[in-house]
Every structure is written in C-alpha cells, then in structure tokens.
Swiss-Prot record:
The name this protein goes by in its record: Alpha-keto-acid decarboxylase
GO biological process assignments: aromatic amino acid family catabolic process to alcohol via Ehrlich pathway
Gene3D superfamilies for this protein: 3.40.50.970, TPP-binding domain
Domain of life: Bacteria
Region (Thiamine pyrophosphate binding): 388-470
Function summary: Decarboxylates branched-chain and aromatic alpha-keto acids to aldehydes.
Residues reported to bind thiamine diphosphate: 53
Organism of this sequence: Mycolicibacterium smegmatis (strain ATCC 700084 / mc(2)155) (Mycobacterium smegmatis)
Requisite cofactors: a metal cation; thiamine diphosphate
GO molecular function, one term: magnesium ion binding
Binding site for Mg(2+): 438, 465, 467
Similarity annotation: Belongs to the TPP enzyme family.
GO CC aspect terms: cytosol
Length: 555
C-alpha cells in the first residue's frame, strides 16, 4: 500500500499474494504506472519487468506451471495484444495466469475520447471482447463491484487452471476500498455422490481381477492430482506410461514405468502394453497431433476407464459431475480392497547405453541428448523448446525429481527462454536447464539478461543447426524461408547483461562433455553452451512426426 491509502489495486495484489504469487511480470505503460507503484510497494510481491510483453507473458506461464498461479500486467491495446500469443498458449495448455490490463480512465471512456493505444473510434472494449476467446473469465472493473469481480475472476482462474482477464482503468485502480475480510472463495468443482457410487460400481465390474494399466498426462498435474495418481500407481503393481505432454509427471525411474506413449511413434514395447491392456486407465489425457503420432493411438474404449477433469467414462458410460481426484481415489480403493496382488512385472531389459563417441567425434543429435539426459540431476527443471530440443529429450528417461516443461499443443517457438525465467523465479531452490534451438531463441533472446538481473544461474543450451530444422523436415529442406541469420551466440550473454556467464561453443563430443561437466560444477553463474549440429540431423521421434505432419498438410 502507498500513501494514497488502501485501494482496489491493493485489494487485487493482496488476493494474488493469497494465491501464492510473489512475483508479478509485465512491461510498464502509462495506463498502469500508478498501479505499479502499489506493486513495488507491496510487502509480499516483487515486480519483474520484461523486455517485451510477449516475453513477460511467457515468463508468467513458466511461473504459473510451478506455482499454480501467475500474474501479468500490460498496458491497454498495444501491450495486451503483444501478450495475446502467450495468453493463448496458457489457455491451450491449462496454465493459470491473471492478465491485468491498465486502461484509460472511466471519464475518458465515458466521453469516448480518442486517446492513444486505442483504435480511434471511442470503443474501449474491443480488446476485452478479444480476450473472451483466450481466457476463462473476464471483468471490466468498476468501483462499485471491483472487489467482487476480482474475486470472481481469480476464483475461476484458480478452478479452471486457465487465464483470466482484468481490465482496470487508472481511476479504478486507485479507488479506495477495504482489504479482504475472508479467504478467497474456492470452488471444489463438485462430485455427485451418486455419480461417484455408480462410477465405482462400473469400474469395479470392468476391472474384475485384471491387472490395471495407466496412461497419464499433463492434466493430472494441472488439476493438482499428482498425489492421487501416485496413490493409484502404488495400490498394486501398475504398469504405467505418460504422453510427452505429461513427461516427468511420474517417477521415470520406477520399475513399473514403461516409457512415453506416442501412438505409432512409440517404442514397440510401450505401445504393446498400453494398447493391449485388459483394462486401461487414461488419466488427464488429451490426444493431440504432436503427442499421439498424429492420432495413431489405438485405444479400445470398451476396455478403458477415462478420468477427466470433471467427468469419467467407463467403457463408454459417462459419470458426472465427478472430480478427477475423487475418481483416482476410487480406483486406488478398488485395487486395495479386492485382495489381489498382481505379480511383479518382468524386469525390463537394461537400457543399452551407447558407448560414448570419441572425444574428437563431430557432435550429433543422438550424442547430444544422451549426454544431456545423463547430466540432469534431481531437482532440475528442464524446459525444452518445441522442435529438436523437445523431441530429442522426450524419449530419454529422466532422473527422479526432474521436472520437464514443454509446450507441445500451442507449440510457439521461443516460449521456453522467458518461461525458464519464470520457472526459475517460481522456485529459486531448483536449477533450470533451458534447451532451445537457434531459430527459436532468436525470437525471445532479449530476456536472457533478466536471468542475471534476477540472480538466476541457469544452464542454457542453444542448439545451432543453422535454421528451422523442424520446418525443413516437414517441407522445404533448402528453402530460403527456413534459413536464419547466423549469430555469434557466445557473445550474447555479456551483450545482454550477463557478463559473468561462462560460455562454450561445442562442435565435438569432447567439447560438449567438458562444457556439461563444468556446468554441473558451476552453480553460481549462468553457463551458456552453444552446440553445433548438422542442419538435417533430426531426432528419430521428430523425424517420424515430421513425416506425419507433411502427409497431413498435403491432404
């Protein structure tokens, strides 16, 4: 609170702090500068400025994935539209971000004045209407109902795990009000006792004495149901897999973890167990083109229990309203109470780690991802940008306690660099590892300096394969539109404000090995590694998906 007394802006900030937000991302603009005075004065919230609104939105997304809530502040029109891509990505991938937009005063709006950052027609709700397509709740705040509307939007964002939009005019932000007197209303979503009872009965009948197999995905994490999932996985010997979207959702070092299921692009052993399971539970699963081998999954609904956010389906029969956690708990109870202990799975063949290449061997995609997977340690938060980084690492098992973040549905290249900033601020006790291609990094690299400003020490790996390799794999191998300008990457950290970063340029396996060894030993500064790869050296999984994408686009 500032010397102006307690305001609507203070109320909003207190509610955000109540939801666990301690950093607010954004770019200043004249329609929210007074509100930002209250942000920087708040005892529990820190302002984190972005190089641009898109980057700030991506950073908020990365923060929200770990914290469960994030906030972004932009100015009217020009600022909010610059952030719209990031907000749309958060909507697609179920990330709770509150987008706070500073607007011209209510007097200006009522008079339909032609002020800057507008379309010049006196209509101040163009962008509010646009926001309805990419947010779950919106409000144009007015003094009489501002606090009630703030509570409504924040509750919806928290419940639905999707972005919300608050339009707050300059005079509304400074309008006097009272602090909250009760906790923010939390909606449970609701489970009908009858729906739960009927679901349990149907699931018990379908499961019988069969071994249960589980395919889990990202929505389990978004809805806060990881503990309930783990309870199910430990109720019996339960073979399980995830989609790439849900990678690191479960402990990949478990003997019951099968690997990544991606339809026809899966390893044969994983595909066989999932598709031939007597009873398969799909938990929080959303099949999209790039995580399902372009919809090549073969899941028999008659043998499937599908656990969704608010409903579940047993062999085609729908049960609702039924929360995900309640359904998972019911399945765990069925296994625990039936008195049958499934035999242990036969030991999986020990993974055949290829011998390390000679130190002077030219670096390849295979060697890069093998060595990077080996370098990751418990507690790391790995952000892999869409493309060779995401698909190169997705097939490797991660150490217990590693968190993997990607964006396979929205698939906006460049997202992970600012998102790594947000993730690092969300949990400073964990080291972030950023894996990003050269083309993607050119879109958002301005945010690199913020890591130094905020005291973060990530490992940054830029995959330099001389352009848009994913696009080359789909179409236009030699086309000019898949080329990018060559940059002197290792000079960028210093140029952008991180002069103490350690930088490496690796063209051989030995150079990569040395760089990653130093990175593991150096925790007090950024380690920036440029790796040189052939432009058409493509991870096998990505190669298969690129062929499918090319075929789909040709139809």
């Amino acid at each position: 609170m500032t010397d102006d007394g307690y305001t609507v802006g203070d109320y909003l900030l207190d509610r955000l702090a109540e939801l666990g937000v301690t950093e607010v991302f954004g770019v200043p603009g004249d329609y929210q500068l007074e509100f930002l005075d209250h942000v920087v004065a708040h005892p529990r919230i820190t302002w984190v400025g972005g190089a641009n609104e898109l980057n700030a939105g991506y950073a908020a997304d990365g923060y929200g994935r770990l914290r469960g809530m994030a906030a972004l502040v932009t100015t009217f029109g020009v600022g909010e539209l610059s952030a719209a891509n990031a907000i749309a990505g958060s909507y697609a991938e179920h990330v709770p971000v509150v987008h706070i937009v500073g607007a011209p005063s209510k007097d200006s709006q009522a008079a339909r004045r032609i002020v800057h950052h507008t379309l010049g027609d006196g209509d101040f709700e163009h962008f509010l209407r646009m926001s309805r397509e990419i947010t779950c709740a919106q409000a144009n705040l007015v003094p009489a109902t501002a606090t009630r509307e703030i509570d409504r939007v924040l509750s919806e964002v928290h419940e639905q795990k999707r972005p919300g939009y608050l339009l707050i005019a300059t005079d509304v932000a400074r309008f006097p009000t009272e602090p909250p007197t009760a906790p923010l209303p939390r909606h449970s979503g609701g489970t009908s006792p009858r729906a739960l009872s009927l679901f349990t009965e149907a699931a018990t009948q379908l499961i019988g004495e069969h071994r249960l197999t589980v395919l889990a995905d990202f929505l389990v994490h978004r809805m806060g149901c990881v503990e309930a999932l783990n309870k199910l996985l430990t109720a019996d010997t339960v073979p399980h897999a995830t989609l790439m979207w849900g990678k690191s959702l479960v402990d990949e070092s478990s003997p019951n973890f099968l690997g990544i299921y991606a339809g026809a692009a899966s390893e044969g052993s994983v595909r066989e167990v999932i598709e031939d399971a007597p009873v398969l539970v799909t938990a929080g699963v959303l099949f999209t083109d790039m995580v399902s081998g372009f919809f090549s999954q073969r899941i028999d609904p008659a043998r499937t229990i599908d656990i969704g956010v608010n409903q579940s389906v047993v062999a085609g029969q729908v049960f609702a309203p039924l929360d995900m956690a309640a359904a998972l708990d019911a399945l765990a109870s069925i296994l625990a109470e039936r008195g049958i202990e499934s035999p242990a799975l036969p030991p999986a063949p020990a993974p055949q780690r290829p011998a390390a290449p000679p130190r002077d061997a030219v670096l390849t995609q295979e060697a890069l991802w093998d060595r990077l997977a080996e370098a990751l340690t418990p507690g790391n938060v790995v952000l892999a940008d869409q493309g060779t980084s995401f698909y190169g690492l997705a097939g490797h098992r991660l150490a217990s306690g590693v968190t993997f973040i990607g964006q396979p549905l929205w698939a906006s290249i460049g997202y992970t660099l600012p998102a790594a900033l947000g993730a690092g601020l969300a949990d400073r006790d964990r080291r972030t590892v950023l894996l990003i291609g050269d083309g993607a990094a050119q879109l958002t690299v301005q945010e690199l300096g913020a890591f130094g400003r905020e005291g973060l020490t990530p490992v940054v790996v830029v995959v330099n394969n001389n352009g848009y390799t994913v696009e080359r794999a789909i179409h236009g191998v030699t086309a000019r539109y898949n080329d990018i300008t060559a940059w002197r990457w290792t000079e960028l950290p210093a140029a952008l404000g991180v002069p103490d970063a350690l930088t490496f340029r690796c063209a051989t396996y030995g150079e990569l090995d040395d760089a990653l060894t130093v990175a593991a030993e150096t925790q007090d500064r950024m380690v920036f590694v440029e790796v040189m790869l052939e432009r058409m050296d493509i991870p096998p999984l990505l190669g298969e998906l690129a062929q499918s994408a090319s075929a789909a686009n040709a139809k």
